[in-house]
């Protein structure tokens, strides 16, 4: 054939890799929705009054260019042997876990397991995590992770206040807690009116506090049993919290045996890299009596409709999406993927392996202590697990520099002390290098531990067979595969969750997070060892400011909900600096549950604003309530586009009313995927927003975390952004590390560079096209609840399934039936009860959109049969989802097995089979079981 020149560019990442529909498919979709072009659709959808003036104009990179560029940045980081400690330790991620979990889209692209029937694998792994934490801490109930140790400690303080019968308003913090933990607790306490008293635990006045927290082992390495203080607290009807270390608890007396009510800490050293601060899975466990006050997710054991054991998220009525400002916490995204990794680390090593690691760590620390003592540098504590603190007088800077010259970072403790922490990756050569830095000889290996008999662990742990069955890597690999096969993630199908933006997490974006130059850096390493991170943070912040119209960014918040909290604290600090006392926050009734929960955490009083029938904010009600608040108005919180999936034209007026009365505007960035390149929050009148990097900017959801929620602010708020003990600032920190979960920022950095400014804008347009295409295709079968003035939706649409209730069909029935078609359900019953909110994102092809539409139409046909007289109990909808076991078990249904298991349009060859039938939610909450069930259940599942 003759030579011809093609305009196809295989290196165009935005249009050839990230954006799903081809130009031809887009043309078909545009024709169906009645738009002449993509730009015409956008002009018809996005009000001219909110459009940005200039375009995003940086160039795109190819995948090869991006990897070369990021390699150059990574090379500017200098990972040293970290012996800083302070809650962060070197660890070895078993390659079996790195390859099969961290690098596996079956694990990292899943959503939070609200639909338990298609999340059984992930739920089992998280149940293993809870069992691991409960066993090691000696407390019966644990949650499925929190954001980091410091925020877990702050959550424990609030939980203690809620549970305590003491009338005190003071919380005691042991002065030997990690500095970042103390600072985050102080930040959390101030807006809640809690007094924090930091001091020597030996001087604790239990009658004057509602609770206290002790670090065990302490930040300086010492071991002190707080049992006496805990007993005094209990006599005063106060609550005792112990911040602890899971590896240490394999050899040390557990908090439960000391009488602790709550235990918190980080599971980071169970196989999760340092990552310049995160992400890491924190944990919390508690006494059984406190379980209903526990923040975060709790995985429990229930049964399905055939009586088979099944896992689910339990006690959800505690959470923000239901209780709003009365919730136990604003926690939404946590750290599920990292909790899964930590649980597999425990399964991989088993109790004997974990104890062996702990013994090796401890005895190396003992040898180092003996060497330093022989050279005249006796550690402060005679008993310790892995950390020594040594007085060195005026030799501190010389010794620290000598250690750095040998490739080792030690901890600067005040002016005349040095901290040294030993961990899993510490070798004898590292011990010798530290000795040389101190100018002493390495002593012979001692035989006796430096732990007193009364602090040695006497109880067994990890006795469940799951921690003994998978020691061989072949079995471990198969176990991880079996669990991932039970889940439905983006590697199998579109996940059309409204307000969740489940878009492509490209492999090239994920690759750099496993590079040691990003993964092996301690968050408190010297700045000259993290120049690559500094460059990346500066560049990404600048691009996010360009995208949003803000002037400054804080990368510290670890989730969107934490970004909300940080943004509201920033507003509160601004008002205080002006000498104003403002505490009222206006929030629309349709807002995400984290909004009112975050406002309450920031010390604000929530006033709810009505919505109109079309979903827009009721401006009359808004103005009336703003004026009633007067000089007490601190802020309003709005989402744009609205939570109803439309571009409200009144957004500027809302901002103007708020500013006229002295308030600040918080614009929730949950729906930024409909704005990038088209509209800038900072130009609309908003003062602060959080950005969900795990939505709009491609960090994967990880089955419930990690996330990132950096906040952008206008210049007048910049001085009031979160600070940190390690980096300074006028305000307290909201996270343990200065830059939050820094090691996943390369994902978003890669995304904005691969796409370029024009690619990001095109992605927004295609996301809007996809939502309008689905709305138009399904509006004849399901009512589309809210549209803009031109009849368009933004990047998501709400399907009204409420009328089907008259026929006995619930939104839950539709969601479960979608599983038989191989789909995760859209967002259920939010922002309107009994509806489905659909967000397709720009990454899905027309073929996948059509497959979803076909499934929804098939379900509508089944609903019509019920409306025409078929009893609801005889419909496949009522019994969905159907499992492979349904093909062989006794069948007494009014419909055939084929109708139930192979609905019209569903895959037959590559069909996804839910592993359980519909889960009984009531049974799971009535009989809460949140640790691993008996061995027989695992054997049955394996068969």
Swiss-Prot record:
Q: What class of enzyme is it?
A: oxidoreductase
User: What is any one of the record's Gene Ontology cellular component terms?
Assistant: cytosol
Repeat as a keyword of this entry, yes or no, is: no
Q: Which UniProt keywords apply?
A: Oxidoreductase, Pyridoxal phosphate
Q: Which GO terms describe its molecular function?
A: glycine binding; glycine dehydrogenase (decarboxylating) activity; pyridoxal phosphate binding
Task: Report the sequence similarity comment from the record.
Answer: Belongs to the GcvP family.
Under which name does UniProt file this protein?
Answer: Glycine dehydrogenase (decarboxylating)
Its gene? gcvP
């Amino acid at each position: 054939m003759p030579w011809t020149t093609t305009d196809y560019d295989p290196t165009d990442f935005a249009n050839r890799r990230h954006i799903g529909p081809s130009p031809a498919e887009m043309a078909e979709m545009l024709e169906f929705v009645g738009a002449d072009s993509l730009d015409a659709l956008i002009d018809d959808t996005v009000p001219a009054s909110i459009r940005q003036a200039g375009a995003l104009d940086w160039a795109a990179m190819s995948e090869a260019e991006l990897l070369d560029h990021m390699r150059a940045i990574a090379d500017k980081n200098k990972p040293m042997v970290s012996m800083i400690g302070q809650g962060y330790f070197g660890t070895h991620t078993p390659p079996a876990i790195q390859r099969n979990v961290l690098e596996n889209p079956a694990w990292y692209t899943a959503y939070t397991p609200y639909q338990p029937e298609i999340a059984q694998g992930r739920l089992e792994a998280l149940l293993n995590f809870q069992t691991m934490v409960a066993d090691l801490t000696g407390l019966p109930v644990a949650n499925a992770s929190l954001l980091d140790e410091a925020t877990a400690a702050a959550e424990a303080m609030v939980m203690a206040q809620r549970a305590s019968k003491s009338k005190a308003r003071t919380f005691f913090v042991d002065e030997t807690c990690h500095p970042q933990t103390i600072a985050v607790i102080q930040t959390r306490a101030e807006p809640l009116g809690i007094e924090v008293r930091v001091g020597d635990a030996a001087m604790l006045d239990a009658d004057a506090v509602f609770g206290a927290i002790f670090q065990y082992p302490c930040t300086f390495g010492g071991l002190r049993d707080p049992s006496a203080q805990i007993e005094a607290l209990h006599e005063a009807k106060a609550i005792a919290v112990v911040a602890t270390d899971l590896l240490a608890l394999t050899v040390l007396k557990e908090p439960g045996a000391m009488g602790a009510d709550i235990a918190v800490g980080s599971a980071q050293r169970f196989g999760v890299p340092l990552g310049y601060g995160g992400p890491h899975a924190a944990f919390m466990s508690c006494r059984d009596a406190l379980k209903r006050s526990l923040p975060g997710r709790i995985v429990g054991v229930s049964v399905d409709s055939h009586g088979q054991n099944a896992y689910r998220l339990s006690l959800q009525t505690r959470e923000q999406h239901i209780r709003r400002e009365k919730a136990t916490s604003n926690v939404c995204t946590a750290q599920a993927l990292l909790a899964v990794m930590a649980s597999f680390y425990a399964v991989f090593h088993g109790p004997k392996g974990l104890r062996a690691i702990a013994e090796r760590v401890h005895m190396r620390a003992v040898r180092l202590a003996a060497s330093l003592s022989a050279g005249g540098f006796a550690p402060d504590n005679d008993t310790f697990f892995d950390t020594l603190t040594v007085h060195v007088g005026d030799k501190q800077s010389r010794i620290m520099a000598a250690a750095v010259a040998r490739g080792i970072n030690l901890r600067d403790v005040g002016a005349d002390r040095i901290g040294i922490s030993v961990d899993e990756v510490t070798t004898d050569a590292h011990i010798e290098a530290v000795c040389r830095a101190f100018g002493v000889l390495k002593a012979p290996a001692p035989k006796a531990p430096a732990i007193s008999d009364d602090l040695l662990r006497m109880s067994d742990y990890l006795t469940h067979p799951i921690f003994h069955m998978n020691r061989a890597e072949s079995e471990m690999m198969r176990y991880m595969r079996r669990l991932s096969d039970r889940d439905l993630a983006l590697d199998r199908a579109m996940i059309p969750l409204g307000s969740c933006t489940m878009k492509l997490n490209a492999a090239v974006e994920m690759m750099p997070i496993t590079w040691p130059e990003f993964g092996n850096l301690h968050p408190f390493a010297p700045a000259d060892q993290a120049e690559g991170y500094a460059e990346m943070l500066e560049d990404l912040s600048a691009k996010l400011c360009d995208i949003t119209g803000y002037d400054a960014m804080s990368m510290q918040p670890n989730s969107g909900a934490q970004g909300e909290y940080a943004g509201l604290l920033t507003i509160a600090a601004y008002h205080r600096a002006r000498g104003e006392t403002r505490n009222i926050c206006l929030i629309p009734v349709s807002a995400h549950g984290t909004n009112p929960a975050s406002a309450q955490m920031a010390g604000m009083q929530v006033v709810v604003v009505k919505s109109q029938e079309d979903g827009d904010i009721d401006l009359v009600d808004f103005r009336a309530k703003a004026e009633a608040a007067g000089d007490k108005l601190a802020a309003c919180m709005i989402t744009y586009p609205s939570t109803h999936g439309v571009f409200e034209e009144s957004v500027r007026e809302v901002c103007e009313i708020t500013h006229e009365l002295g308030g600040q505007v918080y614009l929730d960035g949950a729906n930024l995927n409909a704005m990038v390149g088209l509209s800038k929050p900072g130009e609309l009148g908003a003062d602060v927003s959080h950005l969900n990097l795990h939505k709009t900017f491609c960090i994967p959801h990880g089955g419930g975390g990690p996330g990132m929620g950096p906040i952008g602010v206008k210049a007048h708020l910049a001085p009031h952004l979160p600070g940190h003990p390690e980096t300074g600032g006028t305000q307290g920190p909201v996270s343990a590390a200065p830059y939050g979960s820094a090691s996943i920022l390369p994902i978003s950095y890669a995304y904005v560079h691969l796409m370029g400014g024009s690619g990001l804008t095109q992605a927004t347009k295609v996301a809007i096209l996809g939502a309008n295409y689905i709305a138009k295709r399904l509006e004849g079968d399901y009512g589309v609840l809210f549209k803009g003035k031109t009849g368009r939706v933004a990047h998501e649409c709400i399907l009204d399934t409420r009328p089907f209730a008259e026929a006995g069909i619930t939104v839950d029935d539709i969601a479960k039936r979608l599983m038989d078609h191989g789909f995760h359900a859209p967002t259920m019953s939010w922002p309107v009860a009994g509806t489905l909110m659909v967000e397709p994102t720009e990454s899905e092809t027309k073929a996948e959109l059509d497959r979803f539409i076909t499934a929804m139409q098939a379900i509508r046909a089944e609903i019509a049969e019920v409306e025409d007289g078929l009893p609801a109990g005889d419909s496949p909808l009522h019994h969905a989802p159907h499992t492979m076991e349904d093909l062989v078990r006794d069948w007494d249904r009014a419909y055939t097995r084929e109708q139930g298991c192979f609905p019209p349009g569903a895959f037959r060859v590559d069909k996804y089979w839910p592993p359980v039938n519909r889960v009984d939610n009531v049974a799971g909450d009535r009989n809460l079981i949140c640790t691993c069930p008996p061995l027989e259940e695992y054997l049955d599942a394996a068969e």
